[in-house]
């Protein structure tokens, strides 16, 4: 169950000093990528940093990194045990996400970081991460429709919730590709609290050294946000370009336009594309990539799709699917530490695909938790054509976990 509010997390953090400055990142899409760019820049600049993003990728502790490296399970469990004890002793009744946030901040205190890159979990104003006492910069990425039952039914209402991460006197970087109405809401809130808004800009000597064609449009905007925020937060002498450039060129963010092999699962020679697009705006960005780089003329694309229960599925499928495509519907498994998250039944996904003009012969219902069979069907249906796995970050996690297990078994017998 999701319970927004700051009283429980504030109590939980009373004994965890925040000696580090935070770059706090909110938004609908692009938050994780911005955080990854920022971590890479801080590491290249030799700033000891931590990062906290959600959801986790494969294991619960991989959502917390120190100097861009996931922490060990031992460190995570030690910090978590202390947080759980405080929660019990003080009868706080904190939520799962509040406990995770407090665990991350406890790790950061122990590891004596200088700067923390913190991704908002949901919204901004009442999100547990907003209990931080010290922020250097806040960032608001692209705003889209998602989690409307918690944040509001319009972009402007959602923007107002995201703007709640601002602090007086702390600059706020805003993705300049946001709609004017969204920018106005954010700027109005900034004026109310006496704050400055800085629109992201792709005009800089740093970005001039990079080729925009090597990035998707959304990635380029995310990089502009990260670079703008970095230079507002980084108060040391200018970080040399020769150190920053490789950090950006080598940065990868799993589950976002990620190309990988599923040979160990299906025997497929060619790569598949993995993307966690789970709302209409993210699906449109994925469509651009698929149409420009994978789909040839009227060639079919084979999709493996899962979605969280309650998502507006037609909004996700409309940009992606064409009548000649094939769709394997699958459910992701239980999400560790997030019992309120449930997968949409596969029958709903195949029905939605049928409504997009894809006949039943081109759809496969893999049932609950049978990702391996969905991938095998997709491999056979695609032939030499492209395969894309999308619709949920939890599906991304399931696939990466399945690959890890397959590779582990393979290594035992090789």
Report the location of each language-model feature:
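Extended acidic/charged loop-beta regions that coordinate divalent cations
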Residues: 103-150, 183-216
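Glycine/aspartate-rich loop-and-adjacent alpha/beta segment that forms the canonical ThDP
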Residues: 393-414
């Amino acid at each position: 169950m999701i319970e927004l509010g700051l009283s429980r997390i504030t109590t939980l953090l009373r004994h965890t000093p925040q000696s580090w400055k935070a770059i706090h990142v909110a938004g609908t899409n692009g938050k994780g990528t911005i955080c990854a760019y920022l971590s890479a820049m801080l590491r290249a600049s030799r700033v000891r940093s931590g990062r906290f993003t959600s959801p986790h990728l494969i294991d619960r502790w991989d959502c917390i990194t120190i100097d861009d490296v996931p922490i060990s399970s031992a460190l995570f469990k030690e910090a978590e045990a202390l947080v759980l004890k405080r929660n019990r002793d003080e009868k706080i009744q904190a939520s799962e996400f509040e406990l995770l946030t407090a665990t991350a901040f406890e790790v950061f205190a122990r590891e004596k970081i200088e700067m923390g890159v913190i991704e908002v979990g949901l919204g901004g104003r009442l999100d547990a991460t907003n209990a931080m006492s010290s922020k250097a910069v806040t960032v608001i990425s692209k705003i889209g429709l998602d989690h409307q039952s918690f944040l509001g039914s319009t972009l402007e209402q959602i923007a107002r919730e995201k703007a709640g991460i601002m602090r007086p006197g702390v600059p706020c970087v805003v993705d300049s590709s946001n709609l004017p109405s969204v920018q106005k809401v954010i700027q109005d809130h900034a004026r109310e609290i006496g704050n400055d808004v800085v629109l992201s800009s792709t005009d800089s000597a740093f970005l001039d050294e990079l080729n925009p064609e090597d990035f998707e449009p959304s990635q380029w905007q995310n990089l502009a946000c990260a670079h703008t925020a970095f230079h507002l937060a980084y108060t040391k002498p200018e970080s040399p370009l020769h150190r920053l450039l490789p950090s950006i060129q080598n940065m990868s963010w799993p589950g976002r336009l990620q190309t990988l092999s599923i040979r160990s699962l299906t025997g497929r020679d060619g790569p598949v594309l993995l993307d966690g697009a789970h709302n209409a705006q993210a699906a449109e960005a994925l469509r651009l990539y698929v149409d420009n780089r994978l789909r040839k003329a009227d060639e079919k694309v084979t999709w493996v799709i899962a979605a969280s229960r309650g998502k507006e599925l037609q909004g996700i499928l409309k940009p992606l699917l064409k009548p000649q495509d094939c769709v394997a519907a699958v459910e992701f498994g239980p999400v560790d530490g997030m019992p309120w998250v449930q997968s949409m039944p596969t029958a709903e996904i195949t029905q939605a695909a049928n409504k997009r003009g894809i006949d039943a012969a081109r759809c496969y219902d893999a049932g609950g938790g049978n990702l391996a069979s969905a991938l095998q069907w997709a491999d056979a249906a695609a032939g030499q054509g492209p395969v894309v796995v999308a619709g949920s970050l939890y599906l991304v996690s399931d696939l990466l976990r399945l690959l890890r297990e397959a590779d582990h078994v393979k290594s035992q017998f090789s």
